């Protein structure tokens, strides 16, 4: 059905809605009881309405005759007295002034027109909910209000007609009565979800229709009339695909409303500031070390840091000033909240980066989620299943369900470096561990490991970890929406010691940490393991024993023998030496090789210079591999001390010429990448590296941690900005990095796109953004794969994969071919009525 063919000046008979027999409309009223809204007295001529933007005509929407008026929930509610007025805190605009409402409607219509121009051809439905008075009750309705609809969006068009039959009571207290628009209107706060299908039918009464018409990402924003500080309506954005990052949409709505002298919740862009605080820098370095050790030791998918937000005074809607922060969720107004952006984070599973992005947009108040409860109590807190929270108690619950994150542990710490500053460390346990005893065992070992790495940190509540056991708060959400907490004893386990200074080597079968003595003395005993793998799970211990039995085979292969096979792939080398690839990786780790130099190098197309660079950049047990036949001068593996003052004068850039830095940068990558393998990445926001000209020293020097923290950059995933500044200085024989462009040819279904990138500066995030922009996709909705030398499609999920991919492509040609694959999410539903259950099938 073409939208231009719809007769919007007439009625919307219920028989046009094909699903009417399958659902009970929560708001059904007769034509005689049609609520009057002055907005309906405003009409536009057909010539003023362009495209898919519509506004109701003078005649109100007509519904089939029914004798009762039901509230937004499916149960009948008692009608309030006719003379009841809403609470002044709601900020409802008085209905006695039709002219004012006509002006508001005209502004909203124009604002949606601006929004439509900014979104282009996106599949999005934007509709307005406005307050009206019906039988003495104040309700929100979208009937008779302007809306905008993307092209070829029949499902959204049908969902729009469904929304016309709904009204949400502003007098109610329950979520079912208020609905999503009602909650936003009453609280004057935005609400959004990556997928409405994560709501329960009580929280979202249109859930059955959303399932039927594939409605997913939804955002609702309050609209204010600035001169009178009144909430005049709600703008609801509806999409047919999952949505993680809503900041661009909020910005577009803000600009559209500002153009017509209206406003909504704003993104408060704070100025770029540099925090040259050595104490805070040291505290974050210690926190990042703990996150890294714990995640790699126990295979945790994600660990991150929350801190109280830096507030600033902003003009409040009711007059005066209140404190706010950078989130566009205005719930932080005047309250203490926490933010996780620009702080230490460690991600093992690359697929949960979307959850990390969502955390950067949401701020948690005291008591919200596990981190909020730990912040409130200043102690330790644990929840076995955060997906059972409601959205009010944990705003990120829908994202936790999307990314299948369940068990969560948080602890509130403070550092002697920073006085009273508080840091909340949040750890998500592996989703596969669901047994209570296994969770307790893992938690006990985790606590002991953290204790071993505490230097300046301690629990805010002064709780000390006992030798054998301790108590922590365990919270649990019940089916009735209540949250209960109790103290439970946790037995402390005693894992083996891990050195504080280490360089992590990422392999799928075993995570290991090298001793600091290895990097300091540049030597290692052949065949002797100077590290241990810590894992409290019994199954992992069995694997560990079997690996030790093969130690004799590993001792027989020396570093000199390995060097002879660097030109080929790891698989070929393993086959030639008579060992399996897994054993080959362990042999490499014993010699200090964190990454195999190359896949199968095409000696014809790759010059001797490039081969020399690849081999020389591999760090062995004796530092860089000094192959005199190819290289007269080895590459150093450490950098000189860095001065903060010099770093301020360096121009920003996006890449670092040195990647293997122990105390400066932690990046774990698999020695031999494979599709679907997990990747580990640590991040802590710092200033970018200066990369113009720099001196390469020929002697070892201790790296310095005197760097300036950048608290403003919101991109938490750019590993090239991590813990480094290089001194900008001219030299007699400078090393100049040569940049050349690589053509990207990506195929998605029947579409093919082509563009060029700089291999020296591009990251996986930037590459996915370029692909998403050209194919009009969400970055979280697809993954990239490339064809390797073995003619296998390999996933590109992190910067390490991209670097390997570019190396492979450079050995063949200057064109990199990628394949774009959709990422599917498994959505659950909680339909209560039999009719909704039918539609879920």
Curated annotation (Swiss-Prot):
Q: Looking at the record, which segments are called Disordered?
A: 649-682
Q: What is its main location?
A: nucleus
Q: Which InterPro entries match?
A: NLP (IPR045012), NLP1-9_GAF (IPR055081), PB1-like (IPR053793), PB1_dom (IPR000270), PB1_NLP (IPR034891), RWP-RK_dom (IPR003035)
Q: Any keyword Zinc? A: no
Where is the PB1 domain positioned along the sequence? 741-823
What does UniProt give as the signal peptide span? none
Tell me the keywords, alphabetical order.
DNA-binding, Nucleus, Transcription, Transcription regulation
General function of this protein: Probable transcription factor.
Give the protein's recorded name. Protein NLP6
Organism expressing this protein natively: Arabidopsis thaliana
| Top-level taxonomy | Eukaryota, Viridiplantae, Streptophyta, Embryophyta, Tracheophyta
């Amino acid at each position: 059905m073409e939208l231009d063919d719809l007769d919007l000046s007439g009625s919307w008979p219920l028989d046009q809605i094909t699903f009417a027999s399958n659902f009970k409309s929560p708001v059904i009223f007769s034509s005689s009881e049609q609520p009057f809204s002055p907005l309906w007295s405003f009409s536009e001529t057909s010539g003023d309405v362009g495209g898919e933007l519509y506004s109701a005509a003078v005649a109100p929407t007509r519904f089939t005759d029914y004798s009762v008026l039901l509230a937004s929930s499916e149960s009948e509610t008692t009608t309030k007295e006719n003379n009841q007025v809403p609470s002044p805190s709601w900020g409802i605009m008085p209905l006695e002034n039709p002219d004012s409402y006509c002006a508001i409607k005209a502004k909203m219509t124009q604002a949606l027109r601006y929004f439509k121009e900014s979104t282009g051809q996106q599949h999005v439905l934007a509709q307005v909910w406005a307050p009206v008075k019906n039988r003495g009750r104040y309700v929100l309705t979208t009937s008779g209000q302007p809306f905008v609809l993307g092209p070829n969006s029949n499902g959204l068009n049908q969902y729009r007609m469904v929304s016309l039959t709904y009204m949400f009571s502003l007098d109610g207290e329950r979520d079912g009565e208020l609905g999503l628009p009602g909650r936003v209107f009453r609280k004057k706060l935005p609400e959004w979800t990556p997928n409405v299908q994560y709501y329960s039918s009580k929280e979202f009464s249109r859930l059955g229709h959303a399932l039927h018409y594939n409605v997913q990402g939804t955002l609702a924003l309050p609209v204010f009339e600035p001169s009178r500080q009144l909430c005049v309506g709600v703008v609801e954005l509806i999409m047919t695909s999952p949505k993680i990052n809503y900041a661009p949409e909020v910005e577009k709505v803000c600009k559209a409303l500002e153009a017509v002298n209206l406003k909504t919740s704003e993104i408060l862009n704070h100025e770029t500031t540099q925090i040259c605080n050595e104490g805070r820098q040291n505290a974050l370095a210690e926190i990042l070390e703990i996150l890294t050790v714990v995640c790699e030791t126990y295979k945790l998918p994600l660990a991150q840091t929350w801190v109280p937000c830096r507030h600033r005074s902003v003009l409040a809607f009711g007059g005066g000033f209140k404190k706010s922060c950078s989130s566009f969720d205005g719930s932080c107004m005047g309250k203490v909240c926490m933010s996780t952006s620009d702080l230490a984070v460690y991600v093992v599973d690359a697929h949960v980066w979307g959850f990390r992005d969502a955390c950067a947009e949401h701020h948690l108040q005291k008591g919200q989620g596990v981190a909020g409860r730990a912040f409130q109590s200043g102690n330790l807190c644990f929840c076995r299943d955060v997906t059972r929270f409601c959205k009010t108690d944990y705003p990120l619950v829908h994202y936790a369900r999307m990314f299948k994150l369940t068990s969560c542990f948080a602890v509130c710490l403070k550092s002697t470096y920073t006085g009273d500053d508080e840091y909340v460390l949040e750890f998500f346990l592996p989703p596969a561990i669901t047994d209570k005893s296994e969770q307790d065992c893992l938690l006990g070992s985790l606590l002991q490991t953290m204790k071993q790495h505490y230097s300046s940190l301690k629990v805010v509540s002064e709780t000390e970890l006992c030798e054998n056991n301790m108590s922590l708060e365990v919270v649990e959400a019940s089916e009735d929406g209540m949250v209960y907490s109790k103290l439970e004893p946790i037995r402390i386990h005693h894992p083996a010691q891990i050195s504080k200074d280490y360089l992590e080597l990422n392999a799928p079968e075993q995570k290991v940490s090298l001793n600091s003595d290895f990097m300091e003395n540049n030597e290692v005993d052949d065949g002797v393991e100077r590290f241990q793998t810590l894992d409290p799970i019994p199954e992992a211990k069995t694997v560990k024993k079997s690996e030790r039995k093969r130690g004799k085979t590993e001792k027989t292969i020396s570093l000199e023998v390995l060097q002879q096979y660097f030109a080929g792939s790891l698989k070929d080398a393993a086959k030639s030496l008579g060992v399996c690839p897994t054993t080959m990786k362990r042999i490499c780790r014993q010699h200090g090789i964190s990454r195999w130099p190359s896949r199968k190098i095409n000696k014809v197309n790759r010059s001797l210079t490039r081969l020399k660079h690849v081999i020389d950049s591999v760090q062995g047990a004796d530092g860089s591999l000094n192959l005199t036949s190819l290289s007269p001068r080895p590459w150093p593996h450490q950098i000189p001390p860095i001065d903060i003052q010099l770093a301020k004068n360096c121009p920003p850039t996006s890449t670092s010429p040195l990647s293997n830095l122990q105390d400066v940068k932690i990046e774990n990558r698999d020695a031999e990448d494979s599709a679907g393998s997990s990747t580990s990445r640590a991040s802590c926001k710092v200033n970018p590296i200066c990369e113009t000209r720099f001196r390469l020293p020929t002697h070892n020097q201790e790296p310095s941690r005197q760097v300036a923290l950048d608290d403003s950059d919101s991109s938490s995933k750019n590993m090239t900005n991590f813990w480094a500044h290089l001194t900008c200085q001219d030299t007699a024989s400078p090393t100049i990095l040569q940049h050349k462009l690589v053509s990207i040819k990506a195929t998605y279904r029947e579409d093919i796109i082509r563009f060029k990138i700089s291999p020296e500066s591009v990251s996986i995030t930037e590459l996915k953004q370029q692909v998403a922009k050209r194919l009009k996709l969400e970055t979280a909705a697809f993954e990239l794969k490339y064809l390797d030398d073995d003619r296998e499609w390999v996933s590109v999920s992190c910067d390490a994969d991209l670097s390997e991919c570019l190396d492979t492509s450079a050995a063949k040609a200057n064109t990199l071919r990628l394949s774009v694959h959709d990422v599917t999410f498994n959505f659950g539903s909680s339909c209560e009525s039999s009719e909704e259950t039918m539609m879920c099938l």
